């Protein structure tokens, strides 16, 4: 039985229940979580969603997520789905769940999708990430959860030149964690923009998909370009080398945000 608190829009729904698949767009501050995926140690985003949706619907719910972000990584537009017989209208799940969620997790929107719609195996057109850097002589405590602090001046023009070599279809094996669980390391990067607003630097990257830690390794490499440790042309050499050890360090998680996942034919 759906346990959603009595509201006017439910008064005339009756008991005609059928299974439906609900898609959620989820935003969160990942600082205090052990990542997306349920694990034995530490509270995760997936765990909170399972708990609160189950409490709302009175069913045992297990969400399926699009991107299993790491501990400390944030999102503005991660995606999850779940199946339910609860009679709450699909578009009202966001409101109902936000009444239950902790302040650092927000359901941006909810909608019904086809019963076989899957957030990972669907037609993903693009994914967009941002990596945020606070570039100043001393840290800003107000930005410590959402930006990576770099005290040495960064040359943005050099970083942009280095980033240009990453645009297009390439084998990004040099830019992924050695634990990447895939044999296909070819991805297409459509665009990389690096913007600076005072002491804030944002690396925004859009592609058809990303390997494990790929964006953070790209950010770590471009930071080395910005500091003058690498020339921009070194990025091309790293790409061609096909060796993880050639690239820069994996940048810390707090600067990374999953901004958006765009799908084709979502409701077909």
List each model region and its residues.
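Structured-RNA-binding interfaces characteristic of tRNA pseudouridine synthases
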Residues: 8-268
């Amino acid at each position: 039985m759906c346990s959603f608190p009595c509201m006017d829009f439910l008064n005339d729904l009756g008991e005609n229940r059928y299974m439906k698949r609900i898609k959620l767009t989820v935003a969160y501050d990942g600082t205090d979580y052990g990542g997306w995926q349920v694990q034995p140690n530490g509270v995760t985003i997936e765990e909170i969603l399972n708990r609160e949706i189950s409490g709302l619907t009175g069913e045992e719910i297990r969400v399926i997520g699009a991107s299993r972000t790491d501990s400390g990584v944030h999102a503005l537009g991660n995606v999850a789905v779940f199946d339910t017989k609860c009679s709450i209208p699909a578009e009202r799940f966001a409101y109902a769940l936000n009444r239950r969620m902790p302040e650092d997790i927000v359901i941006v929107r909810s909608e019904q999708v086809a019963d076989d719609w899957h957030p990972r195996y669907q037609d993903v057109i693009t994914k967009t990430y941002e990596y945020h850097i606070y570039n100043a002589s001393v840290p800003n405590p107000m930005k410590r959860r959402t930006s990576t602090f770099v005290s040495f001046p960064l040359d943005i023009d050099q970083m942009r030149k280095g980033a240009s070599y990453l645009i297009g279809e390439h084998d990004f094996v040099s830019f992924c964690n050695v634990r990447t669980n895939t044999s296909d390391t070819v991805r297409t990067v459509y665009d990389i923009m690096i913007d600076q607003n005072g002491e804030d630097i944002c690396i925004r990257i859009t592609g058809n998909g990303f390997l494990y830690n790929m964006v953070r390794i790209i950010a770590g490499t471009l930071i080395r370009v910005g500091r003058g440790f690498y020339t921009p042309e070194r990025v091309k050499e790293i790409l061609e080398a096909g060796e993880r050890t050639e690239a820069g360090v994996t940048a810390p998680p707090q600067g990374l945000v999953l901004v958006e996942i765009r799908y084709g034919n979502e409701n077909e």
